């Protein structure tokens, strides 16, 4: 257990001396899915948001897979940590590409569980934290 303790102390010192986000717990590929309304042909609106977070370079990128829904706000984001919550700010041409106010997404982390909220999630309650899956890309 000493090594872990040492690692923890070291990482605390490290983050105190560094203004960039060094919390690698945020790094990786994440996915959240939303199901929307049922359409006349029996199919259902489906949205899958894929986030790749690279905290060392202070950036994230969003790609989407969707059926029957418009795609907005895809592309690059910059990161800020605000009282333990990771906020994502869209870097693109806001007006045309992303109609939602910054930060577009907020991510919180409790243990191994991740949650995300954002105005883009139109099929959830406003301000609702949705489960965010950390995925391992093959």
Where are these regions (language model features)?
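Sec-dependent signal peptide recognition
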Residues: 2-10
């Amino acid at each position: 257990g000493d090594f872990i303790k040492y690692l923890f102390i070291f990482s605390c010192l490290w983050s105190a001396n560094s203004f960039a986000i060094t919390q690698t717990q945020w790094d990786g590929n994440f996915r959240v899915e939303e199901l929307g309304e049922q359409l006349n042909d029996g199919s259902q609106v489906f949205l899958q948001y894929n986030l790749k977070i690279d905290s060392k370079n202070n950036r994230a990128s969003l790609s989407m897979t969707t059926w029957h829904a418009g795609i907005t706000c895809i592309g690059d984001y910059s990161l800020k940590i605000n009282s333990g919550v990771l906020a994502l700010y869209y870097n693109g041409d806001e007006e045309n590409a992303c109609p939602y106010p910054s930060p577009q997404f907020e991510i919180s982390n409790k243990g191994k569980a991740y949650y995300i909220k954002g105005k883009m999630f139109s099929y959830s309650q406003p301000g609702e934290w949705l489960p965010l899956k950390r995925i391992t890309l093959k």
